[in-house]
């Protein structure tokens, strides 16, 4: 395999020699860092089972090797990699899998370990969405996730990935994570803090990742991490589980941050060892029970994961002084709720009691019921999924609702050919051989919903969002 030319500061190498257990080879560490990272994917079980995905993609000749800590995760090797980018395959476009680095699947595995079934979860640093979508899949779109992202530009990317993967149980916020301990004290059953870090573990993906590295910056970052972890711990309910993770390798940003929390809240913090998370986990185990994954251990990105439990309540922090503002939505109940539920069902959109109908002017939304108790406590960037816009002739059903809620076996679903599906993704109208009998047509491919479209004569008018339209080579050569 080709080698990367990775930039290693001398001080970094000295730090790694000190941090690395004596059971590991430093030469193997350097060699692993210089190998390109193996590609990996996670099957999105909100849309397809692992068995059905493997059967669907079997004709492609993809070599899929299971990732030991994630039942839905696979390292992938493809003969057609140069001909067709993984992100342009039909299965990726319809949300059947997420391109995700193998070690970044570890934190969510830890969050749900030991048969943990949280109902309200916060992902404190969520973009671009790999872990939020993984959490949603583990929850089966039930309960609720608050997905926070501090970077405004990344919130849009986060929402696009949630939409593609059919996630319906999530609220988005755009805050510095340090506000949540005061704003939402002891409100969450589980919290994932995949903390901003120095990124020492990503050199296999970015050989220049350490160009701006310094020991001083590590200490500055660790100070921010301590504040974020403290905020997350305050937002966690007693008995709840918190996972702290980074994609860096130094102890200051990893073990030291967790030990600081334990020293600060001695009687409230319990470390939960991860030695049984997956077979062979003990190869990366620290004395505290954390996983400190150097890249040569499992041939993946460098990573750190710690799991802890909050065993007692904490005194509340001073209440935040910001104003949330008036909430512009009202709940829909009774006849109005029944009417839109029946109209949605007629076009193949179905949901259960986990989602509640709300309205803002002519917009109809579905909010996860488990998030409603947070309304008025924090300002949301986006809450739930937009179901429809009402107009004189009925409802204009929204793309994100179709992807998340549509029943692909609906009586009036129109299954496209590969060529027609590619035309759909290019934003072009479809002229099917068999004209549907209804005006609102659920368009599917590989029995996955692509959108709801209007039939106009013999034409199916394309409703694929303009910002998602693809050019360039797509997947027809692959199906």
Swiss-Prot record:
NCBIfam families: nop2p, PRK11933.1. GO terms for biological process: rRNA base methylation. It catalyses: cytidine(1407) in 16S rRNA + S-adenosyl-L-methionine = 5-methylcytidine(1407) in 16S rRNA + S-adenosyl-L-homocysteine + H(+). SUPFAM superfamilies: S-adenosyl-L-methionine-dependent methyltransferases. The active site is at 247 (nucleophile). This is Ribosomal RNA small subunit methyltransferase F. HAMAP family: 16SrRNA_methyltr_F. Belongs to the class I-like SAM-binding methyltransferase superfamily. RsmB/NOP family. GO terms for cellular component: cytoplasm. It comes from Salmonella arizonae (strain ATCC BAA-731 / CDC346-86 / RSK2980). S-adenosyl-L-methionine binds at residues 125-131, 149, 176, 194. Specifically methylates the cytosine at position 1407 (m5C1407) of 16S rRNA. It is an enzyme of class 2 (transferase). It comes from the Bacteria. Its EC number is 2.1.1.178. It is found in: Cytoplasm. Keywords: Cytoplasm, Methyltransferase, RNA-binding, rRNA processing, S-adenosyl-L-methionine, Transferase. One of its GO terms (molecular function) is RNA binding.
């Amino acid at each position: 395999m080709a080698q990367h030319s990775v930039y290693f500061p001398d001080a970094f190498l000295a730090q790694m020699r000190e941090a690395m257990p004596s059971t590991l080879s430093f030469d193997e560490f350097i060699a692993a860092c210089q190998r390109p990272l193996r590609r990996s994917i996670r099957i999105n079980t909100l849309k397809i089972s692992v068995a059905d995905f493997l059967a669907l993609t079997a004709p492609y000749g993809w070599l899929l090797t299971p990732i030991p800590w994630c039942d839905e995760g696979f390292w992938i090797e493809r003969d057609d990699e140069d001909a067709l980018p993984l992100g342009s395959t039909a299965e990726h476009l319809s949300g059947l899998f997420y391109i995700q680095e193998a070690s970044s699947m570890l934190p969510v595995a830890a969050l749900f370990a030991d048969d943990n079934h949280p109902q309200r979860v916060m992902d404190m640093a969520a973009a671009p969405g790999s872990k939020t979508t993984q959490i949603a899949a583990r929850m089966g779109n039930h309960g609720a996730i608050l997905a926070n992202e501090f970077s405004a530009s990344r919130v849009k990317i986060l929402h696009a990935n949630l939409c593609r993967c059919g996630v319906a149980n999530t609220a988005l916020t755009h805050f510095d994570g340090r506000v949540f301990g005061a704003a939402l004290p002891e409100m969450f059953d589980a919290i994932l803090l995949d903390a901003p870090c120095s990124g020492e573990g990503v050199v296999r993906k970015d050989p220049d990742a350490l160009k701006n590295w310094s020991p001083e910056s590590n200490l500055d970052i660790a100070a921010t991490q301590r504040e974020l972890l403290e905020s997350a711990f305050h937002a966690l309910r007693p008995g709840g589980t918190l996972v702290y993770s980074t994609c860096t390798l130094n102890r200051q940003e990893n073990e030291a941050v967790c030990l600081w929390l334990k020293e600060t809240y001695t009687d409230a913090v319990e470390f939960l060892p991860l030695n049984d998370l997956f077979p062979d986990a003990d190869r990366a185990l620290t004395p505290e029970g954390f996983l400190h994954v150097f890249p040569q251990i499992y041939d993946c990105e460098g990573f750190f994961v710690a799991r802890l439990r909050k065993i007692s309540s904490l005194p509340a922090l001073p209440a935040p002084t910001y104003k949330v503002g008036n909430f512009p939505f009202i709940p829909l109940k009774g006849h109005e709720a029944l009417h839109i539920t029946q109209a949605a069902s007629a076009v193949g959109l179905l949901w259960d009691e986990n989602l509640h109908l709300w309205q803002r002017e002519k917009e109809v939304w579905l909010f996860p019921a488990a998030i409603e108790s947070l309304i008025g406590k924090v300002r949301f960037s986006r809450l739930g999924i937009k179901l429809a816009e009402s107009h004189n002739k009925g409802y204009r059903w929204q793309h994100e609702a179709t992807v998340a809620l549509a029943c692909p076996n609906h009586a009036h679903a129109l299954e496209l050919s590969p060529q027609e599906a590619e035309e759909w993704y290019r934003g072009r109208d479809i002229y099917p051989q068999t004209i549907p009998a209804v005006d609102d047509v659920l368009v599917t491919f590989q029995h996955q919903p692509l959108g709801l479209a209007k039939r106009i004569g013999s034409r199916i008018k394309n409703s694929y969002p303009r910002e998602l339209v693809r050019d360039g080579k797509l997947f027809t050569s692959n199906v």
